[in-house]
């Protein structure tokens, strides 16, 4: 029997409507419009596409947006000056600097320069620390999206064994921190595996919930998955192009093989991907409400 397919597009659409309603209510009751500033350095086509999708989503939800493109040869001083301006702008609730950045710009310096209260990507050290302590903070968008996918699919997280394959600062580490918190929608036992892990299949087969986030197409095969497990595929790798020039994407899981063994599984595309951008919008809304003193 094939697995239940967790449709991230449908779940993200439901959250989108919730956010739209809140944005309308916030403007009507308090005269507040959330605002997102995006910053893009250089001409990377994929980065341009990601930023465009965020701008369009803002427009769709009634969130004010500004886009600040900088040339490929921009200096760290150029970027820090812009960030300081955005930090001080009351119209801007959240700031997103699209990565990767050119080699001459230190990503850590840029992240540290963003006001933690406007760090809607959730990667400022202050927000990372708050996340580890279980305090209110902006959660990184993709890991938060994974958690919401599980919760809204009715999948129990509490008391389960979650195995995450991948230890990146973007997904693996923050997701582990989110899911091990003593809180609703978390409280799991979490194991992180990586390139140095020995006997990887033995560990992944112990997972009630298996999360693949290493960026290796079809790395997770059916022999690595326990019968009846939930499999979340965070991987998104371009493996080619259609005759029309559209990207062909592959996840980290051999979907066709694993779906015959898992209880539930996310596809690629239309799985985790749509959740990332909607969590960014949710963080932007939250930032606006916090700035207005409506929530802590």
UniProtKB/Swiss-Prot annotation:
Pathway: One-carbon metabolism; tetrahydrofolate interconversion. It catalyses: (6R)-5,10-methylene-5,6,7,8-tetrahydrofolate + NADP(+) = (6R)-5,10-methenyltetrahydrofolate + NADPH; (6R)-5,10-methenyltetrahydrofolate + H2O = (6R)-10-formyltetrahydrofolate + H(+). It comes from the Bacteria. It holds the Pfam family THF_DHG_CYH_C. GO terms for cellular component: cytosol. NADP(+) binds at residues 166-168, 195, 236. Its EC number is 1.5.1.5, 3.5.4.9. GO terms for molecular function: methenyltetrahydrofolate cyclohydrolase activity; methylenetetrahydrofolate dehydrogenase (NADP+) activity. The keyword Acetylation does not apply. CDD domains: NAD_bind_m-THF_DH_Cyclohyd (cd01080). Gene3D superfamilies: Leucine Dehydrogenase, chain A, domain 1 (3.40.50.10860), NAD(P)-binding Rossmann-like Domain (3.40.50.720). GO terms for biological process: L-histidine biosynthetic process; methionine biosynthetic process; purine nucleotide biosynthetic process; tetrahydrofolate interconversion. Keywords: Amino-acid biosynthesis, Histidine biosynthesis, Hydrolase, Methionine biosynthesis, Multifunctional enzyme, NADP, One-carbon metabolism, Oxidoreductase, Purine biosynthesis. Homodimer. Belongs to the tetrahydrofolate dehydrogenase/cyclohydrolase family. Catalyzes the oxidation of 5,10-methylenetetrahydrofolate to 5,10-methenyltetrahydrofolate and then the hydrolysis of 5,10-methenyltetrahydrofolate to 10-formyltetrahydrofolate. This is Bifunctional protein FolD. It comes from Dehalococcoides mccartyi (strain ATCC BAA-2100 / JCM 16839 / KCTC 5957 / BAV1). The gene is folD.
């Amino acid at each position: 029997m094939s697995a239940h397919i967790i449709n991230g597009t449908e779940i993200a659409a439901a959250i989108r409507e919730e956010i739209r309603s809140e944005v309308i209510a916030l403007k009507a009751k308090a005269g507040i419009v959330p605002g997102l500033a995006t910053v893009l350095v250089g001409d990377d086509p994929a980065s341009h596409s990601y930023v465009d999708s965020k701008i369009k989503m803002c427009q769709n939800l009634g969130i004010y947006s500004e886009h600040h493109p900088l040339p490929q040869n921009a200096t760290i001083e150029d970027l820090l000056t812009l960030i300081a301006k955005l930090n001080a702008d009351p119209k801007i609730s959240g700031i997103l600097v699209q990565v990767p950045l050119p080699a001459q710009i230190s990503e850590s310096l840029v992240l540290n320069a963003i006001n933690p209260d406007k760090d809607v990507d959730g990667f400022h050290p202050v927000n990372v620390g708050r996340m580890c302590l279980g305090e209110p903070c902006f959660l990184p968008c993709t890991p938060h999206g994974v958690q919401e996918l599980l919760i809204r699919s009715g999948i129990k997280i509490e008391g389960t064994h979650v195995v995450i394959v991948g230890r990146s600062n973007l997904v693996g580490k923050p997701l582990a921190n989110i899911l091990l918190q003593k809180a609703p929608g978390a409280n799991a036992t979490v194991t992180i595996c990586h390139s140095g892990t020995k006997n990887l299949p033995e560990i992944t087969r112990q997972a009630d919930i298996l999360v693949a986030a290493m960026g290796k197409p079809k790395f997770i095969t059916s022999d690595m998955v326990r019968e009846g497990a939930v499999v979340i595929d965070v991987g998104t790798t371009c493996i080619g192009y259609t005759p029309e020039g559209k990207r062909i994407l592959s996840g980290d899981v051999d979907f066709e093989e694993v779906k015959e063994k898992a209880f539930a599984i996310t596809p690629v595309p239309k799985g985790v991907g749509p959740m990332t951008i909607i969590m960014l919008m949710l963080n932007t809304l939250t930032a606006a409400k916090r700035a207005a003193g409506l929530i802590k």
